[in-house]
């Protein structure tokens, strides 16, 4: 094999001739050339290397005798960095030198070539083949690993006492033969008296490995020789667990006939039936149910087989379990039912199967509705199914579950609004969801998102347009606070009846105001526990650096929706800070125009919840438009 090198655009091939040219040099001369080549490469920059290599790298097995591999680097190792001509030659030289020094073990060579005569001759010559190498491997282990039956027999005849001797990984010859699928070697060892239940360091027996490899013949032979079908590995898994995970019915039949317990549990309380349900192995599930396995088995965390099948979306398994009487009202340690997890995963068909058999009382006790989970994951189809089944659309999250969310959300509607899911929001509102139940009103979330469609839906269904945040009190509606950075949005809310009067009811009036608070985000900071938080004044919030530059236009918009008000000294400071805002100060001077005051009086009489009905009043169109602020002249 030749390696193509492209240096400065000149392709070259390193062949046997160039190798011979360099191989005559001494090591000191080669080192000197390496230094010079490295300096030259740095001077002229990188080169482009294209290496032709085989698609698969042939490596010796991990158990290979260490004294025959420790000094040998892999022949076909790939190099990631480009190499110059000299590096390639040096690599070939070093490999050749190493291979010349590597010892060839005659015993291993004889075993790999199945040379029984050579092996027997060595034994007769007095060579001790019962001494392990530093990994604990005997020639017997090698013969079992490579499946060389004749060599195995010869070694056993010479050293019968080592038949069950283990490597440093606690592997016997029987274990190695099973792992490699050498059934003839396995059978010979068992006939010769090998113990079938000796496990490796992971407590995995030959029978366990045979099930893992789906080797039916090996399983049958091991069971015939009384291998323990209920032995547990360090995870508590039995051979039956392993065969169920692979849906190997033939092996399962052999194991159960050989005494395997269908209710054996691993370290996490998981039975073979639980494994079948979890991994969606329907045939294995049917087999275990036929042999009396508990359909309602639960793991250590109380999750049932049905719960796991729902979580992993195994529809046919869920259908079979329910047909066998599986209890759909068993909760896991978190109080979650199969319906909860199916709603969370968005599996419509499984939800439809669970709805008729799920207790509404158990759902209420859980402290969370499937509606919450469907809305949280935007599973609209499942949400429709749950609403069609008349689940309580206003069911709140239990306090301990609400505390898991920073905003202390409670309703399914809140989840839909947070996700900006207009369709789910509409579904929930049409089903009767109350938009005013959460600590933070969903309308405020919609304002933060800037979604007019969601805002309109919430307001049409009774959302409080003057919503406040109880945990962060303000002297003016939080809806105004959230909309300040978008004047068109602020006007939209004011048109729909938001109350702007509190913005001009300052505690300090024309008197001096206290210093502005430090520039920390007080609306994200938790209030001090030793005193109740004070309400934030409008002028205080308007003084925040990110808002103050819009102070004039914000005040201008709000003045269109209030009567005779008094600007406090701080608001006047903001207006005076920019000469073009002087007209706003004049606009605020009382008395306000009579037409404007009449408009406010009419709108107040109608009320904020009926303001959308202005078009139905028996008034001229021009007056209607004036009342709706469509004509501000």
From Swiss-Prot:
ANK repeats lie at residues 102-131, 135-165, 169-198, 202-231, 235-264, 268-297, 301-330, 334-363, 366-395, 408-437, 438-467, 474-502. Keywords: ANK repeat, Cytoplasm, Cytoskeleton, Phosphoprotein, Repeat, Ubl conjugation, Ubl conjugation pathway. Pathway: Protein modification; protein ubiquitination. The keyword Phosphoprotein applies. Its main location: cytoplasm. InterPro entries: Ankyrin_rpt (IPR002110), Ankyrin_rpt-contain_sf (IPR036770), ASB2_SOCS (IPR037330), SOCS_box (IPR001496), SOCS_box-like_dom_sf (IPR036036). It is found in: Cytoplasm, Cytoskeleton, Stress fiber; Cytoplasm, Myofibril, Sarcomere, Z line. Residues 579-633 form the SOCS box domain. The keyword Cytoplasm applies. Residues 26-45 form the UIM domain. GO terms for biological process: actin cytoskeleton organization; cardiac muscle cell development; cardiac muscle cell differentiation; heart development; intracellular signal transduction; proteasome-mediated ubiquitin-dependent protein catabolic process; protein ubiquitination; skeletal muscle atrophy. The modification Phosphoserine is found at residue 369. GO terms for cellular component: stress fiber; Z disc. It comes from the Eukaryota. Monoubiquitinated. Substrate-recognition component of a SCF-like ECS (Elongin-Cullin-SOCS-box protein) E3 ubiquitin-protein ligase complex which mediates the ubiquitination and subsequent proteasomal degradation of target proteins. Mediates Notch-induced ubiquitination and degradation of substrates including E2A and JAK2. Required during embryonic heart development for complete heart looping. Required for cardiomyocyte differentiation. Involved in myogenic differentiation and targets filamin FLNB for proteasomal degradation but not filamin FLNA. Also targets DES for proteasomal degradation. The SOCS box domain mediates the interaction with the Elongin BC complex, an adapter module in different E3 ubiquitin-protein ligase complexes. Component of a probable ECS E3 ubiquitin-protein ligase complex which contains CUL5, either RBX1 or RNF7/RBX2, Elongin BC complex (ELOB and ELOC) and ASB2. Interacts with SKP2. Through its interaction with SKP2, likely to bridge the formation of dimeric E3-ubiquitin-protein ligase complexes composed of an ECS complex and an SCF(SKP2) complex. Interacts with JAK2; the interaction targets JAK2 for Notch-mediated proteasomal degradation. Interacts with TCF3/E2A; the interaction is mediated by SKP2 and targets TCF3 for Notch-mediated proteasomal degradation. Interacts with DES. Belongs to the ankyrin SOCS box (ASB) family. This is Ankyrin repeat and SOCS box protein 2. It comes from Bos taurus.
């Amino acid at each position: 094999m030749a390696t193509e090198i492209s240096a400065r655009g000149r392709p070259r091939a390193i062949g046997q001739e160039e190798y011979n040219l360099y191989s005559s040099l001494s090591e000191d001369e080669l080192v000197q050339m390496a230094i010079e080549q490295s300096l030259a490469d740095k001077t002229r920059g990188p080169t482009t290397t294209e290496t032709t290599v085989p698609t698969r790298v042939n490596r010796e097995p991990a158990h290979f005798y260490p004294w025959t591999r420790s000094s040998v680097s892999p022949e076909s190792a790939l190099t990631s960095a480009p190499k110059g001509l000299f590096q390639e030659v040096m690599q070939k030289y070093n490999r050749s030198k190493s291979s010349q020094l590597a010892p060839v073990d005659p015993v291993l060579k004889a075993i790999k070539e199945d040379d029984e005569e050579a092996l027997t001759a060595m034994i007769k010559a007095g060579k001790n083949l019962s001494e392990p190498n530093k990994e604990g491997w005997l020639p017997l282990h090698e013969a079992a690993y490579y499946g060389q039956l004749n060599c195995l027999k010869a070694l056993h005849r010479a050293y019968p006492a080592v038949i069950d001797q283990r490597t440093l990984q606690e592997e016997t010859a029987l274990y190695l033969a099973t792992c490699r699928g050498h059934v003839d070697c396995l059978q010979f060892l068992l006939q010769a008296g090998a113990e079938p239940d000796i496990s490796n360091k992971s407590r995995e027996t030959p029978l366990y490995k045979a099930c893992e490899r789906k080797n039916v013949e090996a399983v049958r032979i091991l069971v015939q020789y009384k291998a323990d079908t209920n032995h547990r590995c360090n995870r508590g898994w039995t051979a039956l667990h392993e065969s169920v995970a692979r849906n190997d019915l033939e092996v399962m039949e052999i194991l159960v006939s050989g005494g395997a317990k269908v209710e054996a549990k691993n370290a996490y309380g998981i039975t073979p039936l639980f494994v079948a349900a979890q991994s969606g192995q329907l045939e294995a599930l049917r087999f275990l149910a036929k042999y009396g396995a508990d359909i309602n088995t639960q793991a250590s965390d109380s999750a049932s087989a049905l719960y796991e099948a729902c979580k992993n979306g195994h529809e046919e398994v869920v259908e079979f379990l329910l047909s066998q009487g599986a209890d759909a009202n068993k909760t896991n340690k978190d109080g979650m039912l199969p319906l909860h997890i199916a709603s969370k995963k968005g599996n419509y068909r499984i939800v439809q199967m669970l709805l008729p058999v799920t207790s509404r009382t158990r759902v209420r006790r859980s402290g969370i509705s499937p509606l919450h989970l469907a809305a949280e994951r935007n599973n609209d189809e499942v949400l429709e199914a749950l609403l069609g089944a008349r689940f309580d659309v206003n069911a709140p999250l239990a306090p301990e579950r609400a505390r898991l969310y920073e905003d202390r959300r409670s309703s399914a509607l809140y989840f839909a609004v947070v996700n900006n899911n207009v369709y789910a929001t509409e579904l929930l509102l049409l089903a009767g969801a109350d938009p005013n139940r959460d600590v933070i009103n969903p309308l405020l979330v919609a304002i933060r998102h800037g979604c007019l469609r969601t805002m309109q839906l919430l307001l049409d269904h009774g959302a409080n347009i003057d919503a406040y945040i109880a945990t962060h009190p303000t002297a003016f509606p939080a809806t105004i606070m959230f909309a300040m950075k978008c004047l068109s949005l602020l006007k939209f809310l004011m048109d729909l009846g938001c109350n702007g009067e509190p913005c001009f009811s300052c505690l300090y009036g024309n008197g001096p105001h206290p210093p502005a608070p430090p520039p920390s985000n007080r609306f994200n900071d938790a209030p001090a526990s030793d005193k109740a938080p004070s309400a934030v004044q409008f002028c205080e919030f308007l003084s925040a650096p990110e808002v103050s530059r819009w102070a004039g236009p914000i005040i201008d918009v709000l003045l269109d929706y209030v009567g005779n008000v008094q600007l406090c000294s701080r608001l006047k400071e903001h207006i005076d800070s920019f000469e073009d805002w002087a007209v706003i100060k004049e606009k605020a001077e009382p008395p306000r125009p009579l037409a404007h005051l009449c408009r406010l009086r009419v709108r107040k009489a109608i009320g904020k919840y009926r303001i959308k009905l202005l078009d139905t009043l028996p008034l001229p169109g021009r007056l209607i438009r004036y009342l709706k602020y469509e004509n501000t002249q």
